[in-house]
């Protein structure tokens, strides 16, 4: 879902982050989306996005998109998560009337009980995580406001 949009959204909120180039990051091989130089530390950032839709509806996406306060079930599947390739994940979740952001250290994802390793058969180092009505509150400590995206949550995620 809309990774180009999500990357643009994150970059507009935090213009200090940069897209890696071979000049700045000679070993770069498209394994992360952005980097942020924090002191002497280069933080590699991967952006993931998903949307809240009625999990039981067969309607088109624009019809089954849920409002934030909806009581209907949803399942946001953050896919192709490769914790070894970045330091930090920024997740963007889109409801019909709201956008939420979470910042995680990659090691926190690897240890999360909802993270399933091996999204595809034979794929090592890649997994997925489902956010839904039943578990979303457990991720509250990782949620950030847009203005705080590069604040202590990001910096704390890699310390």
Task: Map each language-model feature to its residues.
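Nucleic-acid endonuclease domains
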Residues: 1-32, 37-43, 48-159
């Amino acid at each position: 879902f809309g990774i180009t949009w999500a990357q643009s959204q994150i970059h507009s909120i935090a213009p200090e982050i940069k897209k890696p180039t071979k000049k700045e990051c000679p070993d770069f091989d498209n394994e992360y989306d952005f980097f942020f130089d924090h002191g002497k530390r280069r933080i590699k950032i991967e952006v993931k996005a998903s949307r809240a839709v009625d999990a039981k509806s067969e309607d088109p996406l624009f019809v089954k998109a849920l409002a934030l306060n909806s009581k209907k079930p949803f399942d946001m599947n953050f896919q192709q998560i490769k914790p070894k390739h970045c330091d930090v994940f920024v997740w963007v979740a889109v409801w019909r009337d709201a956008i939420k952001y979470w910042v995680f250290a990659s090691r926190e994802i690897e240890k999360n009980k909802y993270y399933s390793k091996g999204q595809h058969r034979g794929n090592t180092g890649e997994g997925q995580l489902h956010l839904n009505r039943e578990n979303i509150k457990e991720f509250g400590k990782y949620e950030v406001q847009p203005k705080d995206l590069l604040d202590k949550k990001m910096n704390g995620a890699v310390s």
